[in-house]
Structures are given as C-alpha cells and as structure tokens.
UniProtKB/Swiss-Prot annotation:
Belongs to the universal ribosomal protein uL4 family. This is Large ribosomal subunit protein uL4. Part of the 50S ribosomal subunit. It comes from Cutibacterium acnes (strain DSM 16379 / KPA171202). It comes from the Bacteria. Residues 49-105 are annotated as: Disordered. The lineage of its organism: Bacteria, Bacillati, Actinomycetota, Actinomycetes, Propionibacteriales. HAMAP family: Ribosomal_uL4_B.
Length: 301
C-alpha cells in the first residue's frame, strides 16, 4: 500500500504524450467501505432541501366556530371543523421544515475520498489526458470522441482545472459526463462514476492541494526558543522551570521572597517558582531563609 503509481498521459488522438504519477497517499490506501457509506449518506442528506411542511389544526384557516352544540344532537361532540379527524382539518405530527445535514469530520471526508480514488486506481479506471480538445475553440464532438476512446462513455467523471474553460464548455452538455473542478472532487461522485478522466492540469491541482493539506496536518508545531533570561532570572545560580539541573535544590517563592532548603520542614509542601544552586545565591537575589525568618518572628513575640 501507499505505492506511487505511474500511468500514461494521452493526447487528443489517444497517443502517449507523457506520464503522470498517482501518489500512494491519495491513490493507494485501504478502502474503508463503511466509512465511504457514512460519508456518502451524509453528503446526500445535506443536499436535501428539508422545506416540507404541513399545517397543524392551529395553522389551518377557519374552524373557529363550534360546529354544533355540545349536547342534545345525538352526534359526537366536536369543537372545530379543523380538527385532525375532519376533512380539511390539520395534520397531526406531520413533517416540518428541518435540516438533514450530518456532522462529518474533515478527516473522515478526506479518508473516504482517498479510499474511493484508490479503489478506482486499482481497477485501472483512472485516465489522464493533456486536453479534451485540440484547438482554441470548444468542441463537444471532439471531446466525446476522446472520452469514447478511453472507455465506455457511461457515467464518466471529468476533473478539470478551473481555468480550463475550453474543455469545460466542450463536455458540460454531454449527458453521460459529469464535470467537476479539482477542488470539487468528492466521494459520492467518485463512487457514482464508472470512469474518472483527469486533465493534466486538473490532476496537478488536485494532488497539489491535497499534498499541501496533508503536510499542514502532519507538520509539527515549532517549539519556541526559550529566552536565557527567563531560565536564569537571578543569574547563573538560579533556574526557572519544572526540571532543574543537578545541584539546584533550593526552592524559592517569589511571592513571599523566601527560600527553603531541603532540611526545611516545609520543603516537601513548597512549590518552587525559582530554583537556586545554594542558599548564598538565594540570599544574593534578595530571598530570605523561611525557617530563620519564622523563628525570628516567634522569638520577637
């Protein structure tokens, strides 16, 4: 899997005009059929208008008058001629406007498309052409002849670059052909097609865009450079961070400007904001020994 496949690029006469590579990460991956089914169902559901609507008894006009009195007629009691059991009445629990869209993560959509394309590539149902028309004018007749020379002209998906106006105009009127821009390629149209025909520019645009997206997802965030002054705020004998170097075992608290030595009874409960190499370095930075300062306060009392 993930092997790059090389196929021939054909000209309008059906002759080889070069070769094109189908990257393995796009055209040779495992095909996850349940995933493709889920994405296609979501895509078709999102295409539904969802504008269906029925009227309830409160929305149907009329029916404000009670049709007959409550008692004495021998008939069943009725309160309105627009009740659901009446002809012309409202509908109970009828369809209302709603959205059928389903949330589908981008990674799932991309994986389904790659799987569908890989299945087509393994069946040799993907073709690449330089162009569908030889000339500067659109020609549906010539485009149809080119496509017929590749495979059966039935459910053909043509993928073009957006700037390829001549080819676009040449095939858009063919009932057997569905044409898309490279950035419009989707799982449903790939699954629904029997053959996919890329123009050279369309394939380059599709592969280029997908490769850029893949690189953006896989790129690791750059680790910001740590400022030396931030690591050593009080000189070389101080260190700010969670993993102090060996020998930095004096804990300093910048809020109280006190430091704790390992022999301090509060050493284990103290969260170090700054580490010092020695007590002298902490005192030089303006910190005082927490144990001595507390004992001096008790003596003063």
């Amino acid at each position: 899997m993930n092997e790059t496949k090389t196929i021939d690029v054909l000209d309008v006469k059906g002759k080889k005009a070069g070769s094109a590579e189908l990257p393995g990460d796009l055209f040779d991956v495992n095909t996850n059929i349940p995933l493709i089914h889920q994405v296609v169902v979501a895509q078709l559901a999102a295409a539904r208008q969802g504008t269906h609507a029925t009227k309830t008894r409160g929305q149907v006009s009329g029916g404000g008058k009670k049709p007959w009195r409550q008692k004495g007629t021998g008939r069943a009691r009725q309160g309105s001629t627009r009740a659901p059991q009446w002809v012309g009445g409202g509908t109970v629990h009828g369809p209302q406007p709603r959205s059928y869209a389903q949330r589908t993560p981008k990674k799932m959509v991309g994986a389904a498309l790659r799987g569908a394309l890989s299945d087509m590539a393994r069946d040799n149902r993907i073709f690449v052409v330089t162009s569908l028309v030889d000339g500067d004018k659109p020609s549906t007749k010539q485009a149809k002849a080119v496509l017929s020379g590749l495979a059966e002209l039935r459910k053909v998906l043509v993928v073009l670059d957006r700037s390829d106006e001549i080819d676009w105009l040449s095939v858009r009127n063919l009932s057997e052909v569905h044409v898309l821009a490279a950035d419009q390629l989707n799982t449903y149209d790939v699954v629904n097609a029997r053959t996919i025909v890329f123009s050279q520019a369309g394939l380059d645009a599709f592969v280029g865009a997908r490769s850029a997206n893949t690189q953006a997802l896989s790129a690791q965030p750059e680790v910001p450079e740590t400022n030396v002054a931030d690591q050593h705020p009080y000189g070389e004998d101080s260190f700010r961070g969670d993993n102090p170097p060996a020998g930095f075992d004096i804990k300093g608290n910048e809020d109280s400007m006190k430091f704790h030595e390992p022999s301090s009874p509060w050493y284990g409960r103290t969260i170090a904001e700054v580490w010092f190499r020695s007590a002298a370095a902490a005192e030089a930075a303006g910190f005082v020994n927490a144990v001595k300062s507390d004992s001096e306060k008790e003596d003063a009392k």
